[in-house]
Amino acid sequence: MITKEFDTIAAISTPLGEGAIGIVRLSGTDAFAIASTVFKGKDLATVPSHSLNYGHAIDPATGQVLDEVMIGAMRSPKTFTREDVIEINTHGGIAVTNEILQLLIRQGARMAEPGEFTKRAFLNGRVDLTQAEAVMDVIRAKTDKAMHNAVRQLDGSLSQLINDTRQEILNTLAQVEVNIDYPEYDDVEEATTELVREKTLQFQALLENLLRTARRGKILREGIATAIIGRPNVGKSSLLNNLLREEKAIVTDIAGTTRDVIEEYVNIKGVPLKLIDTAGIRETDDIVEKIGVERSKKALEEADLILLVLNASEPLTEQDRNLLAISDMANRIVLLNKTDLEEQIEVDQLPEDVIRISVLQNQNIDQIEEKINQLFFENAGLVEQDATYLSNSRHISLIEQAVQSLHAVNDGLKVGMPVDLLQVDLTRCWQILGEITGDAAPDELITQLFSQFCLGK
């Protein structure tokens, strides 16, 4: 019986729905043989590898032509999965792609699990775990900078850094073993201790520098979580619609219209801004609105940036003052909306510079984008070309654990602990880093990671 890891799998690799092209993918030992049974055209057994071949998809049981197709034929090992791969390019549409997929399954292929093509690429050594995870980051990237960061990881920038560090740790452990087992001079113990101290500090500095990129990397991957807050009916939803340049939120003069949290993305200087339009934070007896208010408060706590909208045409209210107090953070921008009306707000009572806007007349909206750029990009140097950024929570957690192991080595050295005992923590650091690339990752973790991928990838 062919095991699950080595049978031939099939899946639709393009999004379901109408489109110009649909692709049904096969990977495995029998990919060419199975595809040949549903293809009328050139003999796939004799076509060159990495060739595109015109023909028709047919039902072998009836001879009925299903579609005019182009078949991409790629032979192992020079494929994404390092197996034989067939890609059947059909006209886009749910019916035709699904019919061809069902034919392939009837001819002996198995329906692929989510992420199974990439999993096979990993199991066959085509990519490591960080590169496999980067595949989904490329797919999910919302801006060009997020995409470039993911592509660098896919190309192996993070893998190379981790692998080089693991090799250096291994070399250090080997040298310690040699010095302990075969001492060639009297002060070998002192020299070995100094070697471990020097190398450990070097590894620690490298990993801590990498951790410092985590905040920026996470922003590139997930966006700047931006909560738009303010009391009801000050123009929050109108601001959201203006930034998005489309109508996403209901806008009325009725307080409490936004009853839930609305999330949308907008591209600011190549970095995704995750805009969260919150329900107006106020005391209310309406149960549905009250739930929205509670969610708004939670969004406020988790935000990287707060856009506080105040009504410039009215004096400050107690609610305004409360919002100013609870949103007092470094990355806050106070917006005075409705400046097209007579200004009555007490600007001298506001704690910082404000931006005067009129969402209705689209005035000074560009100043908001410039301020965000100043807060996150210019001051922090958010994106440096060719830099490696940590953006994956799993990677961040593991590197934090690796740094803790190195701290344990240094703490042991300070109290005079024998070097051979400190090898345990240094070895643990090496193993933890291996979990990042997949060299030391448990099977359960690998299965879980690939289950989060989309079907057909």
From Swiss-Prot:
(6S)-5-formyl-5,6,7,8-tetrahydrofolate binds at residues 25, 87, 126, 457. Binds 1 potassium ion per subunit. GO terms for biological process: tRNA methylation; tRNA wobble uridine modification. Its EC number is 3.6.-.-. Keywords: Cytoplasm, GTP-binding, Hydrolase, Magnesium, Metal-binding, Nucleotide-binding, Potassium, tRNA processing. This is tRNA modification GTPase MnmE. Its cofactor is K(+). Mg(2+) binds at residues 237, 258. Pfam families: MMR_HSR1, MnmE_helical, TrmE_N. GO terms for cellular component: cytosol.
